[in-house]
Amino acid sequence: MISVTTKDELRSLIQTELYYHGADADLNFIDVSQITDMSCLFKGLDIWNIKIDKWDVSNVTDMYCMFFMCEKFTADLSKWDVSKIIGITEMFTMAKKMTEELKPKFNNLRYVSLN
């Protein structure tokens, strides 16, 4: 397990893994439990079946545009603990393959626009 503490560290590691392992890389080895901001994290990346279902996102508060323009992206995120999230505007905009069953279950939101 590799621990990251900032969004910039995480994005850099993701880009490296995608370069070496392709758009369906297994990223579950990354400990993201200290990250609070995942806004625009995957924005525009050519990803489809990356493995991030085991990520501990329980401290994340912002997922704004996280998968924006990730048209082929599909992953089961339904078990993510998103209880601290307050912003997800355009989180799945243009992520056409993501179904409601695969999306996290949001309850306490201030800014909502999943698209």
What are these regions (language model features)?
Residues 1-115:
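Negatively charged
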